[in-house]
Amino acid sequence: MTQYKLDYPFAIAFKPQHMGNVLAETLGTQGVNQVHVAETEKYAHVTFFFNGGVEKVFPLETRDESQDLVPSNKSVPTYDKAPEMSAAGVAKQVCKRVKEQKFEFIMNNFAPPDMVGHTGVYEAAIVGVEATDKGIGEIYETCKQENYLLFITSDHGYVVSYKPLHPCWFYSASVAG
């Protein structure tokens, strides 16, 4: 439908929108050091998508995939089999980055509420949300100790519009989902 890659060999129905002055770009031009942390399943969300759908590293945006790209568990067929995903590793890396005191802006994405929610396995979704909650708690405590402001938001997460036992691998138009 739209052109996500320049080398697609088929007709495009909708040209991609150009997003100018995205937050990462604005922070960089204002002299704000930044880093983005996520596990493999959501790393594109804190880089490519957050940066307006472009493969670009903006000024003062640190990308160290050896540290800030936390490996997702690839040993399971679906994430209801390991619903914590890598929430603990993401939280640990965010806390490490906060303690370094090098970045005025640190963002992350926790995958379990979305990825586990899509499986339709209610008990697993609870475990995934609990792992995320624990990670947020650790980040909160570290931010408090290091005098950082913590701002929590969400773009979506399938678990909020949950229907147990009904796997859903698409995104709804619901504000909740």
Segments from the language model and where they lie:
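Feature captures the catalytic ectodomains and active-site-proximal regions of enzymes
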Residues: 1-177
